């Protein structure tokens, strides 16, 4: 069973059931045939394929075309045997159950094994296999495609047909070997019969050996004297030998000087010259042996001129033909020289001298090359040529095989022992016609070979043209894709240029408009403020460019990151609409403003209340960045200019603007969210800055507090000391008191510089700082301040300072105590901020703060609660409150 595939759609190791080197079937099974069931897809005529890619392409083209035409697959039976591959339609068992089996009607195709060109399966779909066969009639190739029900079955069919090639090759080799064995057996039987017919042949050779030298010396046409190493040896003429080939015969060293002349007597009744009384004498050269003969001088000139007109006319008059015997009575008995057909004859010009006429022994090469003027005598026999040297190469073979095995020339031969008749012999004209016909057939075959070569060149040219066209189409596709990409890049560049143009124009438009400030609230007193002192520093915000801070090479230097992330520009509005829409908005107005970023960096940047410069993070991390923003020193100098222009006056809390209820979805409610919009936190910053400036103005200007009406003394208890007051007293409820002397202006400037903190803004509101990671820094003010003790005193002892109605005079107060005006404390309490204490007073611990000026020897009497209770009852025996407690 095949192993389940684990390496993808095609695994040759897992799909092959057995090793390819092991035969799949027994060879005897191919004699009967191996049957398979499959579905026949279709066939199509294709050119001769050269590569596997062309074969797979032809297979898939057949599948797709037959599927597009809607031709259904037909179930067939495939039989693979040594005869070939036979495809037969399957019978329908229900309809044709009673009918006889007629295979001729159901036969689809039959191809012998030697006509099958290629067989393979599709690597993508293992159920599909095909084989390409050559049609014998049209000499074309057809691709036949089949589909099996299982992948393993398709592979078994392919391997079965592949094994059939080997089986047929072995069968052909066995048949050839059997044929050679039969021929060898027949030749052996014939040689044994001839040996029994002429037992005295060897004795005659020994007796006639001495006469051979005399005949060679007296005859000019004979070879030089015998001097070969094999002369005079007794050799058997009837021993079978191995057939000679061109290479073996050409390389064999045989001494031609040891070849004598032999006389063969052949009766011929077709010519009146050659009568039985005057038997025909044929000169015969035997290799390395001699036959018994008798020399009889006779002229051959007249005989040869009368018999053949194609032989050379110049003949030496001294040439004689030997005879076998001088007895004329023996000439009537036809004698035939018996020689085995597989006798080797060396030659260099023609590889097969014995195959043209095996009945007549041929001359060796030495006689054909050395003595060209010697006439070679041939009897008048069918299928023979006057001279073997005049034949072209290949015509001496009786069977001619064309390169495509389509033409075979079988030459007829006759035995010498059969009597010749005048009706069965052909004339010289008929022989010439036969020769011309064979030459014509050879020319036709040459033309056919040339045509096949031309067709092959055409196919190669077609495949190369197709490949070049495919390469050109692929190049065209790549060029079109590159063109599309270039167009997209050009569109992006044009869009970026348009955005830069719009941003630059927006910057110029915003810088050309004069900055408009919020209306400053005028106090109720007649003393006006200095016009140089603005209550809002919105125009000093580095996010808003001035006339001199615009740089054309930095178009994004003042663009908020929210607008850049949204991919659009902020809407163009008038300055009045911007002032109206500042702060937290109820509804988003555009896609650019409706951006929400829940980044953690923006969250912890907003947690600190310490106001930092606009680009504090980027300046700390990279101080070499060229950004045109005001530094902290410039901001502090501006604050000092504001302090220098202060004039004394009264201060009061300006009334807040009443916002009209907006008609929106939220109906006036604030839409709080996390966003990169820098306008959302500006209102809080302005309020904080305005309160800080008002604090500074209140501290600088002398105030006249109106006298408060006398308040009723309340009974102060311990419970009431630690309960929050429902109605805290205001400044008007307090008694007027004389303010302590104000400190100098320089000290006040110092305190103001301490209280003023730099405005806070997230790093993501600017493009320059948004590209760098934010830096967490502790919330430390510019100048070290210590508001912790005051805040603690405000929160813990608020009720104590509120419940005391009568405050002691400044003369009675301890000189070490902090002297702070009540109006300053009330304003600080109202705003949640207290100025730092003086440097001469230092409170380190809470215990020291609570138990100050307490006599520890008299703890029950000098404790804080005892003092407060007695003071509330009017008992001032314990003295004033300790230093550090609020009044």
From Swiss-Prot:
Low complexity bias locations: 510-519
SUPFAM superfamilies (alphabetical): PH domain-like (SSF50729)
Coiled coil: 434-506
Annotated ranges, domain PID: 30-197
Keyword Coiled coil: yes
Region called Disordered, residue ranges: 176-254, 506-606, 641-753, 804-839, 853-887
Keywords linked to the UniProt accession: Coiled coil
Signal peptide: none
Stretches with biased composition (Polar residues): 242-254, 597-606, 816-827, 863-887
Ranges of compositional bias, category Basic and acidic residues: 176-186, 205-216, 573-588
GO biological process, one term: regulation of egg-laying behavior
Entry annotated with the keyword Magnesium: no
Single Gene Ontology MF annotation: nitric-oxide synthase binding
Function, in words: Together with dys-1 and hlh-1, participates in a common muscular function.
Known partners and oligomeric status: Component of the dystrophin glycoprotein complex (DGC). Interacts with zyx-1.
Protein name per Swiss-Prot or TrEMBL: Dystrophin-like protein 1
């Amino acid at each position: 069973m095949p192993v389940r595939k684990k390496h993808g759609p095609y695994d040759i190791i897992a799909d092959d059931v057995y090793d390819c080197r092991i035969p799949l079937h027994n060879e005897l099974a191919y004699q009967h045939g191996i049957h398979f069931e499959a579905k026949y897809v279709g066939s199509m005529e294709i050119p001769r394929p050269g590569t596997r890619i062309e074969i797979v392409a032809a297979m898939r083209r057949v599948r797709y075309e037959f599927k597009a035409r809607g031709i259904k697959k037909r179930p067939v039976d495939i039989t693979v045997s040594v005869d070939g591959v036979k495809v037969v339609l399957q019978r329908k068992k229900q309809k044709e159950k009673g009918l006889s089996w007629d295979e001729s009607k159901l036969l689809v195709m039959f191809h012998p094994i030697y006509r099958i060109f290629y067989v393979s399966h599709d690597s993508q779909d293992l159920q599909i296999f095909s084989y390409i066969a050559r049609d014998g009639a049209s000499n074309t190739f057809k691709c036949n495609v089949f589909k099996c029900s299982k992948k393993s079955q398709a592979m078994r069919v392919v391997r079965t047909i592949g094994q059939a090639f080997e089986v047929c090759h072995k069968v052909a080799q066995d048949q050839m070997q059997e044929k050679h064995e039969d021929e060898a057996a027949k030749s052996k039987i014939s040689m044994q019969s001839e040996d029994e017919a002429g037992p005295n042949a060897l004795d005659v050779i020994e007796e006639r050996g001495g006469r051979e030298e005399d005949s060679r010396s007296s005859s000019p046409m004979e070879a030089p004297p015998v001097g070969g190493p094999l002369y005079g040896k007794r050799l058997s003429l009837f021993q079978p030998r191995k057939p000679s080939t061109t290479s073996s015969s050409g390389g064999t060293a045989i001494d031609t000087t040891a070849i004598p002349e032999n006389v063969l007597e052949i009766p011929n009744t077709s010519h009146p010259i050659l009568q039985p009384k005057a038997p025909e004498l044929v000169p015969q050269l035997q290799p390395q042996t001699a036959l018994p003969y008798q020399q009889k001088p006779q002229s051959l000139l007249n005989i040869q001129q009368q018999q053949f007109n194609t032989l050379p006319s110049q003949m030496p008059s001294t040439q004689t033909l030997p005879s076998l015997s001088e007895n004329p009575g023996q000439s009537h008995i036809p004698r035939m020289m018996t020689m085995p057909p597989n006798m080797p004859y060396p030659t260099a010009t023609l590889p097969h001298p014995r195959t043209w006429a095996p009945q007549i022994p041929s001359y060796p090469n030495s006689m054909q090359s050395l003595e060209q003027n010697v006439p070679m005598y041939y009897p008048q026999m069918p299928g023979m040529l006057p001279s073997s040297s005049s034949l072209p190469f290949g015509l001496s073979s009786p069977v001619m095989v064309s390169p495509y095995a389509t033409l075979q020339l079988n030459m007829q031969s006759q035995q010498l022992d059969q009597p010749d008749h005048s009706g069965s012999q052909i004339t010289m004209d008929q022989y010439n016609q036969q020769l011309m016909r064979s030459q014509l057939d050879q020319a036709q075959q040459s033309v056919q070979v040339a045509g096949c070569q031309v067709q092959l060149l055409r196919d190669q040219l077609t495949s190369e043209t197709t490949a070049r066209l495919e390469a050109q189409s692929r190049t065209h596709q790549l060029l079109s894709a590159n063109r599309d990409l270039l167009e997209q890049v050009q569109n992006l560049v044009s869009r970026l240029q348009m955005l830069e143009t719009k941003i630059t124009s927006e910057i110029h438009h915003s810088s050309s408009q004069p900055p408009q400030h919020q209306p400053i609230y005028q106090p109720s007193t007649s003393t006006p403020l200095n016009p140089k002192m603005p209550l809002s520093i919105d125009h000093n915000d580095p996010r808003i460019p001035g006339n001199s801070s615009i740089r054309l090479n930095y178009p994004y230097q003042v663009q908020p990151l929210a607008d850049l992330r949204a991919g659009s520009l902020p809407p163009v509005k008038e300055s009045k609409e911007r002032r109206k829409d500042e702060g937290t908005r109820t509804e988003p107005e555009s896609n650019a403003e409706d951006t929400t970023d829940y980044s953690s960096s923006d969250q912890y940047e907003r947690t600190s209340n310490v106001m930092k410069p606009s680009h504090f993070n980027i300046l700390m991390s990279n101080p070499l960045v060229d950004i045109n923003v005001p530094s902290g020193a410039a901001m502090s100098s501006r604050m000092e200019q504001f302090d220098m222009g202060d004039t004394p006056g009264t201060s009061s809390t300006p009334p807040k603007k009443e916002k009209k209820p907006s008609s929106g979805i939220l109906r006036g409610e604030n839409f709080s969210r996390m966003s990169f919009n820098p306008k959302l936190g500006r209102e809080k910053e302005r309020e904080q800055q305005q309160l800080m400036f008002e604090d500074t103005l209140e501290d600088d200007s002398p105030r006249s507090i109106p006298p408060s009406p006398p308040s009723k003394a309340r009974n102060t208890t311990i419970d009431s000391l630690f309960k929050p007051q429902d109605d805290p007293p205001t400044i008007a409820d307090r008694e007027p008191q004389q303010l302590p002397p104000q400190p100098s202006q320089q000290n006040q400037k110092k305190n103001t510089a301490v209280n003023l903190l730099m405005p806070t803004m997230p790093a993501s509101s600017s493009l320059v700082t948004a590209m760098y990671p934010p830096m967490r820094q502790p919330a430390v003010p510019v100048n070290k301040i210590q508001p912790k003790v005051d805040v603690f005193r405000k929160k813990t002892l608020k009720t104590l300072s509120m419940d005391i109605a009568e405050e002691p005079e400044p003369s009675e107060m301890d000189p070490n105590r902090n002297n702070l005006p009540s109006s300053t404390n009330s304003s600080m309490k109202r705003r949640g901020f207290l100025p730092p204490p003086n440097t001469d007073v230092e409170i380190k611990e809470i215990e020291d703060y609570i138990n100050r000026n307490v006599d520890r020897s008299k703890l029950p009497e000098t404790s804080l609660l005892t003092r407060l209770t007695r003071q509330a009852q009017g008992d001032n025996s314990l003295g004033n409150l300790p230093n550090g407690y609020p009044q």
